[in-house]
């Protein structure tokens, strides 16, 4: 039994012998308490706390904690398997600036197969979720405020509070998780990284690889790939893959890529003010629309929405198209949403953008150019945010022989399949599984991908190639 599983067993025994059933269920679904908490003011101490939000109905014990570090605190949740047979699993959420603790229900309802044999550790990485200080930017809530002005206001507020905006980087986040592992008394664990969380996982392999038994990299972002430079071709590949599917299914007789090119070409010359559900008018140019299309296609339901939305836009019904895309796109903003915009900016502006071409090349293809113009907008925001560039090592390729499962979907416009293939070629003990029907982060939404992850963490090694379940 793993160290963390041993602690869980002790807690279960004490709870069942000392607590009434009602209190036992409360402990199991929210925060479990112990009497030997370290001093909350001590650096690198882990203390218990109530779980945030509503309790999630489950038979499993779920405990929540706060890891106190020298820069602030991290929110942590542990989902305790009833009878763990393998090492614990650290889940690394995407973003940057995402969250995991408030989204623990995604593991519990329905219960993930991983929890049949493994405890799962969830952590809100620095700057996001319930971790402190938060780099969330509620200033972005007002759609009438230009993004640059909103980011400037957020920066000013954080600076007035003494928050170090440059503290959220790949390197610092990975170092936090080494402290978390030690604080939990874990000698070795599995990693499950999703999207940008895969980059944190790769950094953990670099700095703490002897403590990693295996890694699952779902929709990976390899450090050596210049993400912004490569993304236009990746978005086009995902859209072309979707067009191939919808033509085969006879759901887009008019095509997808051609009509979208025409729409984007018009918006590049003449942005359109669209009235959104709140009644506010919002301007859409080609860069903003392609980002919304990509966000929608990346979502689990995107395959069923994007082709219809493009058809609506091609008919001149842009507002209806945008409303349909917004229904499925993951475009959360500030308080209570899944994304801390400041944490995302800090990491992107320090870890990624400086290593990309400062002057994106326009090709004349409306899709490629719309994506490239999005990078120009991010650079403008980084100029406002102003954080230092990370050391060059953050951009070096990772080499490891740790057993690794890589998952990639051909419909993923956020982390294209080409990146996964490149990473698989470099890692010495990796299996790459692809699917033409997966989009972004399939292990969190697709039953086949989730099953492959659970089997891999239990020691089974799937065959490389297309998913066979």
What are these regions (language model features)?
Residues 272-291, 297-302, 334-342:
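Structural motif
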Residues 27-29:
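C-terminal motif of bacterial Sec signal peptides marking the signal peptidase cleavage site
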């Amino acid at each position: 039994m793993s160290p963390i599983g041993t602690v869980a067993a002790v807690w279960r025994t004490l709870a069942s012998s000392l607590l009434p059933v009602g209190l036992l269920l409360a402990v199991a679904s929210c925060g479990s308490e112990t009497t030997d908490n370290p001093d909350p003011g001590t650096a690198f101490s882990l203390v218990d706390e109530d779980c945030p939000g509503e309790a999630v109905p489950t038979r499993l014990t779920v405990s929540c904690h706060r890891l106190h570090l020298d820069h602030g605190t991290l929110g942590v949740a542990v989902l305790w398997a009833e009878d763990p047979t393998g090492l614990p699993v650290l889940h690394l959420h995407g973003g940057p600036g995402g969250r995991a603790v408030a989204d623990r229900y995604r593991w519990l309802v329905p219960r993930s197969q991983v929890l049949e044999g493994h405890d799962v550790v969830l952590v809100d990485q620095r700057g996001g979720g319930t971790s402190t200080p938060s780099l969330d930017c509620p200033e972005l809530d007002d759609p009438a405020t230009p993004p640059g002005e909103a980011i400037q206001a957020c920066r000013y507020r954080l600076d007035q509070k003494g928050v170090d905006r440059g503290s959220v980087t790949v390197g610092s986040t990975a170092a936090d998780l080494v402290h978390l592992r030690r604080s939990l008394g874990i000698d070795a664990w599995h990693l499950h990284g999703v999207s940008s969380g895969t980059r944190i996982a790769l950094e953990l392999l670099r700095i703490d690889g002897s403590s990693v038994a295996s890694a699952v990299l779902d929709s990976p972002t390899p450090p050596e790939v210049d993400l912004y430079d490569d993304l236009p071709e990746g978005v086009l590949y995902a859209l072309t893959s979707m067009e191939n599917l919808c033509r085969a299914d006879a759901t887009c007789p008019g095509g997808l890529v051609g009509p979208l090119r025409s729409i984007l070409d018009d918006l590049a010359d003449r942005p359109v003010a669209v009235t959104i559900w709140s009644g506010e008018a919002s301007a859409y140019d080609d860069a903003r629309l392609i980002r919304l299309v990509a966000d929608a296609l990346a979502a689990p339901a995107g395959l069923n929405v994007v082709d219809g939305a493009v058809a609506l836009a091609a008919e001149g019904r842009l507002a209806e198209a945008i409303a349909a895309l917004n229904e499925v796109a993951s475009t959360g903003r500030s308080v209570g949403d899944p994304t801390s915009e400041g944490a995302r900016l800090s990491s992107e502006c320090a870890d990624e953008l400086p290593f990309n071409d400062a002057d994106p090349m326009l090709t004349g293809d409306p899709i490629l150019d719309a994506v490239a113009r999005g990078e120009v907008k991010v650079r403008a925001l980084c100029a406002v945010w102003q954080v230092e560039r990370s050391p060059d090592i953050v951009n070096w390729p990772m080499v490891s022989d740790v057993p690794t499962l890589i998952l990639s979907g051909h419909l993923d416009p956020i982390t294209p399949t080409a990146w996964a293939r490149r990473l698989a070629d470099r890692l010495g003990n990796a299996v790459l599984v692809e699917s033409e029907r997966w989009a972004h982060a399939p292990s969190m939404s697709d039953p086949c991908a989730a099953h492959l992850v659970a089997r891999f963490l239990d020691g089974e090694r799937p065959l490389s190639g297309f998913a066979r379940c």
